[in-house]
């Protein structure tokens, strides 16, 4: 039986860490041999016991614009940058813990109101198990044949209200929940992943997760409860190249990311806001490079189908599902 290479690369994959409406953080692990790992869909890999992972992720969202006027007050959302810096630790072969600190930059067209700063710290626990005649926790050592078994993870996480939910923008200063630097209260997330390597070069990955929010009352007296976010993701990773002598691997990835947004409940609007929420299907094409103990992933993500809630005449510019494209890149290293 072939043995797996001793170098395991921990990499950033999209996991249900609570950074909703503000980008989604990522977790996972893979090696130069064995299952591949997508860019935006969480794999079912955990960190090796006693190993640390450092990761950085950027999700750059460029939005479509609809109003050609440059008059004051007509500025539309230009782009958002969702940065994340995180660290993970493998307490057991089957148990990994992560902490992620996001930093958001939200920029309007020239003359608009911008927002930037650190947002709510997120924590996550990932428990890994597999099926080999029976369900079991992931063991410390697995052969390449063992890695072809179905692997799963259960993910539990929350965000802590460390960001400034009452961050103000404009003149006179106002609080815009969509550009706030936090949710004001903890949010909670949970999810499942499943991974199956079905050939030497091909791996299928599936993910289901959900994020729930609490109502928060701002200093202005208004309150907001963001709608629940549900994600269903599927991905195929194909190994394009491996050079063991250089500890190098290159994978190509194709993904479908489905996002269901619940309606926001804003105290300034009677009942759930009719111009929020809906369904979005994103297509993702990406590459992942592995070298030594490092990994770099890059992908283009675009909405290919949407069914957004809106009242007649509402454009929803700057909303999820209205992007021209999203560029996602992740870098991670294990130590």
Enumerate the language-model features and the residues they cover:
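Outer-membrane beta-barrel biogenesis signature
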Residues: 19-57, 61-65, 130-153, 164-165
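Surface-exposed strand-loop-strand hairpins of Gram-negative outer-membrane beta-barrel proteins
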Residues: 23-31, 59-83, 170-183
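Outer membrane beta-barrel transmembrane domains
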Residues: 65-73, 220-335
């Amino acid at each position: 039986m072939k043995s797996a290479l001793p170098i395991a690369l921990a990499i950033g994959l999209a996991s249900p860490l609570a950074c909703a409406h503000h980008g989604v953080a990522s977790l996972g692990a893979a090696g130069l041999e064995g299952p591949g790992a997508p860019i935006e869909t969480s794999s079912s890999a955990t960190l090796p016991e006693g190993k640390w992972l450092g990761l950085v992720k950027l999700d750059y969202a460029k939005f479509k614009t609809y109003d050609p006027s440059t008059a004051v007050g007509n500025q539309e959302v230009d782009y958002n940058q969702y940065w994340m810096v995180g660290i993970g630790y493998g307490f057991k072969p089957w148990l990994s813990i992560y902490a992620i600190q996001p930093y958001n930059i939200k920029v309007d067209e020239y003359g608009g109101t911008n927002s930037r700063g650190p947002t709510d710290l997120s924590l996550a626990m990932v428990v890994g198990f597999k099926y080999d005649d029976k369900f079991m926790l992931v063991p410390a050592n697995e052969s390449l044949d063992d890695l072809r078994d179905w692997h799963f993870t259960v993910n539990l996480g929350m965000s802590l209200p460390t960001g400034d939910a009452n961050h103000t923008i404009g003149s006179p200063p106002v609080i815009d929940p969509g550009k706030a630097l936090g949710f004001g209260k903890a949010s909670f997330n949970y999810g499942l992943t499943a991974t199956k390597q079905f050939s030497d070069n091909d791996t299928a990955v599936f993910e289901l997760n959900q994020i729930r929010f609490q109502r928060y009352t701002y200093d202005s007296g208004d309150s907001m409860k963001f709608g629940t976010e549900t994600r269903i993701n599927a991905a195929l990773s194909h190994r394009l190249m491996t050079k063991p002598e250089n500890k190098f691997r290159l994978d190509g990835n194709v993904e479908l990311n489905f996002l269901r947004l619940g309606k926001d409940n804003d105290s300034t609007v009677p009942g759930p806001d009719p111009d929020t929420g809906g369904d979005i299907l994103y297509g993702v094409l990406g590459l992942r490079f592995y070298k030594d103990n490092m990994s770099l992933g890059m992908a283009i993500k675009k909405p290919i189908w949407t069914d957004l809630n809106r009242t007649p005449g509402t454009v929803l510019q700057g909303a999820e599902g209205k992007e021209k494209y999203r560029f996602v890149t992740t870098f991670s290293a294990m130590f």
